[in-house]
Amino acid sequence: MGYKKTFRYSTGNPIVDEVGTMNFTGNVIPMVWFKTIRYPNGAPHNNAIHILADIVYWYRPKEERDEESGQLIGMKKKFRDDYLQRSYDQMAETFGLSKKQATEAVKALENMGIIKRIFRTIQVRGQILNNALFIKLVPKRLYEVTFPEEIEENTLSPPKEIPLSVECTSQQKLDT
């Protein structure tokens, strides 16, 4: 497989046709997150947005197909345990952040109710690791920050503003 593939149909724009032959995979960032995932001052929380996109990628199911027929036989999770395991160091490395920035972004997502942090003691290659971070995604809250207009449309009473920005308490400021 080379760079150029043939495109069966044409859009009339050669660049669009060429990009249409590329199979992009990975993280997807809905544009609405830049409006719904924000700091208290109203600025988009870019670090939290990128980390959330990665978390959602891991929670999206992958297709399981029969090798011979190619038929879809089921869906599987992409990670081993009941929840996604990630470390702050992994997230920092992936997104070019400091560990402190990654930690703050994850805490912001938890404060918004989009994820829940779970800390466990685990054993890896015979070594005990305390406080291993597992991330539980909260689908209902993810839906609310991704489709806020649908939440407002479906309410019978006047829509209430969904608290989406992160308010840091003085204790949280001391923790960071």
Question: Where do the protein language model's features map onto the residues?
Answer:
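Charged low-complexity intrinsically disordered patches
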Residues: 2-21, 137-176
